[in-house]
């Protein structure tokens, strides 16, 4: 499991560490302070670079804004919207989310349907 954020990577790591969940993630990818990686698309491309051994068609983005969904579309990765985040569900569906979940416990079933 990886975290891909448009927020600075080091900030993401500190937040995850603060909540004691950093070790739950195999990779944390975020924006760079030098501006080299800034947009969601650039962050996701960096994920693809770091995880080059994983086929893109085996990846999925779980997001809470239309920007997450649009970024996933730009790198040809399916996306699942969560209804309990910051974004509007209708905007995420319009942007192309393949599914919407209201609870993380729904994720295994939705992933099974998407990848079967």
Region spans (language model):
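Hydrophobic alpha-helical segments typical of transmembrane helices
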Residues: 11, 43-44, 88, 96
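A short, structured active-site edge motif that brings together acidic residues
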Residues: 22-37
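Conserved Lys-Pro-Asp/Glu-containing loop-to-beta segment of HAD-superfamily phosphomonoesterases
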Residues: 40-71
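Substrate-recognition element of Asp-dependent hydrolases with the DxDx(T/V) motif
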Residues: 1-16
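Acidic, Mg2+-coordinating phosphoryl-transfer loop and its flanking beta/alpha structural elements
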Residues: 61-101
């Amino acid at each position: 499991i990886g975290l891909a954020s448009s927020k600075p990577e080091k900030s993401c790591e500190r937040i995850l560490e603060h909540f004691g969940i950093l070790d739950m993630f195999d990779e944390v990818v975020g924006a760079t302070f030098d501006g080299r990686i800034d947009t969601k698309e650039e962050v996701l491309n960096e994920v693809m670079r770091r995880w080059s051994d994983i086929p893109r068609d085996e990846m999925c983005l779980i997001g809470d804004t239309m920007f997450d969904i649009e970024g996933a579309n730009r790198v040809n990765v399916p996306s699942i919207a969560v209804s309990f985040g910051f974004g509007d569900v209708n905007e995420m569906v319009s942007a192309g989310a393949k599914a919407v979940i209201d609870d993380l416990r729904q994720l295994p079933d939705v992933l099974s349907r998407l990848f079967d």
